[in-house]
């Protein structure tokens, strides 16, 4: 594994931790708190950084896992923007049901992409 791939793997694990704190905070409070939005934004930054490291380290832009990862990153980016917009417009108001469910779906999809990457490495593909 190249140093860039190692950096990407380490960074994506940090993104997982950050996304998890952000999503769990939002889901439990049913509100977009400052803490939740901070961890979601950090997660997106780490995720983008990890994605760039992995593309450069692997030398391939388009793979099946890459497409899965890009779509998962896009989902979390949209979730973060929607959560931030809700916070700006509604302050501490309860998160609407649709946003609450979208958060779960985007996070679940991201975890699927994360796990599939680990499985691909474990299976040597």
For every predicted segment, state its role.
Residues 12-31:
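Hydrophobic, membrane-facing alpha-helical anchors
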Residues 21-25, 46-60, 82-89:
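Membrane-helix exit/interface motif
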Residues 99-112:
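Individual transmembrane alpha-helices with interfacial aromatic-anchor signatures
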